[in-house]
A protein has these predicted regions:
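Alpha-helical positions within canonical tetratricopeptide repeat
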Residues: 81, 169, 242-245, 249, ...
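Long, repeat-rich segments with strong aromatic
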Residues: 252-257, 302-313, 319, 323-327, ...
Length: 433
């Protein structure tokens, strides 16, 4: 009889213990018990161990891509090879101080590009740059900042490449942006008109080089990336003689983003300011478009309040519902009209014109966790996790109906998901019942 009482008492106490868990503890336990998260993280790390190129179908090493898997690469790749891959970017920095998009061995330079980049100190490689964008310099600064955070290798800042240290070269990249891509009227960086963070412009068959067909445009993505880059410079070299300038630039860019690009009434960023002519066809309201990727980077840059983050996230979810796309990786909504871009992007919900990219959706998940919105982050990452398992790979982007497209093992997608999973599980470990 006493044994029965003891057992019943134990069960009752256990029941009270389980039901006494807080919502936070239940969520933490659910995250920690989700084997799909562990599976996808393992898959991501295996993908990134295969090299520093952007993914299957890409022979090139891109700065904007490496920026999103560098932290995982620091844990999974050969440290010397990773360091050398980073330094090679600086070897290919151009005489005008601009940074390239990426590089490849000369024998693998097999595509059409009428403006290849070369350097005497990197004789085996050829570089390339989609000049419609203005994120290359910022992306490489992010890479170095993240690399130092993960490895503690501050010596890379003093590494001399072609007569200048890495830190000096990064400061020269800031000089280049302020000299060549800074609009004085608005106090912001500009590039050519593209779809949010994209690197393809309309009105041009090739679409990747700034030229006479380009429409200069100011957007939140380029400027948020620059704000983050300046934060990294201040973190890496707080005692530099350039630190006061970096701090002043950071404050000015952040203020001007809020002044000129934030639409207070609609609680969203406007897509573009056009200092010259607008390419938008009559009758189409570009101001109604929500740029999901640029917004995620703006959150990372600290440009939105917690209340605003909740608002834009709710809007992203509504845009996903209205569009019928799979996840908040949806690049933008509403999409640009049929035929506005050329080639494949001329159709809505294709590639950067409304395709669904884990590469940016995963970064939004990261920011939700960082800003304490873990329940939302976990719910919103699930469609991305499920499609990796279903399709056995990290596809570059997804079209209508969740159809996988582009590179089948896109390392940017793998990197952002792995980091998001680590953030979720770290939070869960601290809050479990």
């Amino acid at each position: 009889m006493n044994k029965i009482l003891v057992i019943v008492s134990f069960v009752f106490i256990s029941f009270l213990s389980c039901t006494g868990l807080t919502d936070r503890q239940r969520l933490a336990n659910q995250i920690l018990s989700d084997t799909n998260l562990l599976k996808v993280d393992s898959m991501a790390r295996a993908t990134i161990r295969s090299g520093f190129n952007a993914g299957s179908g890409y022979s090139q090493i891109w700065a904007r891509d490496m920026n999103t898997f560098i932290e995982v690469a620091c844990e999974e790749s050969d440290p010397h090879e990773l360091r050398e891959a980073i330094l090679l970017f600086f070897a290919l920095q151009q005489p005008n101080d601009e940074m390239i998009d990426g590089y490849v061995l000369k024998e693998d330079f097999t595509w059409y590009d009428d403006t290849p980049y070369y350097s005497d100190v990197a004789p085996k490689h050829v570089a390339f740059k989609n000049t419609v964008e203005t994120d290359q310099e910022s992306s490489l600064i992010h890479i170095v900042g993240k690399y130092i955070r993960k490895t503690g290798d501050r010596g890379i800042l003093d590494e001399v490449v072609a007569g200048k240290t890495v830190l000096e070269r990064m400061n020269l990249m800031v000089d280049y942006l302020m000299r060549e891509r800074y609009n004085k009227e608005y106090g912001l960086l500009y590039g050519a008109m593209t779809a949010d963070w994209g690197d393809v412009q309309p009105n041009d068959d090739f679409g990747c080089d700034m030229n006479d067909l380009s429409d200069p445009a100011i957007d939140v993505y380029d400027n948020a990336m620059f704000v983050i880059a300046l934060d990294y410079l201040l973190e890496m070299a707080p005692d530099s003689s350039q630190a006061p300038r970096w701090r002043s630039l950071r404050e000015g860019i952040a203020k001007n983003v809020r002044t000129h690009l934030w639409d207070e009434k609609r609680q969203k960023f406007i897509p573009h300011i056009y200092p010259e002519e607008s390419p938008i066809p009559e009758g189409f309201d570009e101001l109604a478009i929500h740029y999901h990727g640029g917004t995620a980077i703006a959150i990372e840059a600290g440009l939105l309040s917690k209340a605003e983050i909740r608002t834009v996230n709710a809007r992203m979810l509504e845009n996903v519902r209205l569009s019928g796309m799979p996840s908040i990786g949806l690049t933008l909504y509403p999409v640009y009209p049929d035929g506005f871009f050329r080639g494949g992007m001329s159709k809505p919900y294709v590639y950067q014109n409304g395709g669904d990219w884990t590469w940016f959706g995963g970064r939004m998940i990261q920011q939700l966790v960082v800003n304490g919105m873990v329940e939302e982050a976990y719910a919103e990452i699930c469609p991305m996790i499920e499609r990796v398992i279903k399709n056995d790979g990290f596809y570059e982007w997804y079209g209508k109906g969740g159809i996988p497209s582009g590179s089948g093992n896109f390392k940017g997608s793998a990197g952002v998901l792995s980091k998001a999973i680590v953030l979720l599980r770290d939070w869960a470990e601290k809050n479990k019942g």
